[in-house]
Amino acid sequence: MIVQNVITHLEELSPLTYAEEYDNVGLLVGNRKAQVTGVLVTLDTTEDVIEEALKNKCNLIVSFHPIIFKGLKKLTGHNYVERIVIKAIKNDIAIYAIHTALDNVINGVNDAICRRMELRNKHILIPQKGTLKKLITYVPKSNLVKVRNELFRVGAGRLEHYNKCSFNIDGKGTFEGNETSNPTIGSQGAFYENAEVQLSLIFEKHLEKIILHTLFATHPYEKVAYEILSVDNHNHNIGMGMIGELPEAMEELRFLKVLKQKMNTSFIKHSKTFNRKIK
């Protein structure tokens, strides 16, 4: 296994395209083609973490927070960030940060906290816009089910709690191939009219490459007619934060105590209490 194999798996779970614009996520240090000897997972990449990685023969660190947040202009070892980067490079240790890419996916950090707190009716607090696209294509009637099912299989047509969503309009497609064409139906230089279906499906933007690859692989025509449109709707599967309801209402101080227990921590910071129940 190489570093890129691990990255591919991580980015299937948490695509970097959904990270906040200010963030610095992805592979920060190291070679994507290096063989992985071990993976160390951490909240922050510190000097002690580098030492632990060396001790345990881990040459890939997967960190939640990025050690490099702003551009480095020098590598002199003047501060801890520079020292960590220098030591990682010297010892061929790759560093990968996931941060808000994992914050913003439906099954990410916030969902894990909600599950630990046993929250019900949970949903994204601040849904992102600009994360959805629409594919419109035109398929011969006889091939519609095959093409549509393959697009469903790779993730097209998912809308929150619903899968396999599409819109289908019957119509007629026309074309006339020139002398360099190789039409699947009809012949060169002949005008042809065929019963087709306009197929429309929504998909999340990180899936565009696999969606188009699947369309081209399953559509019978030599030249596939299609359009990709950006959709500005809120995506309630992508966004920052998550909100839900506790199994039962409880006083604020009791909630804080339960929170400490559930999160297995002895210390938390909180805002001023108002002697109200939390649900």
Positions of PLM-derived features:
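Hydrophobic structural segments
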Residues: M1-K279
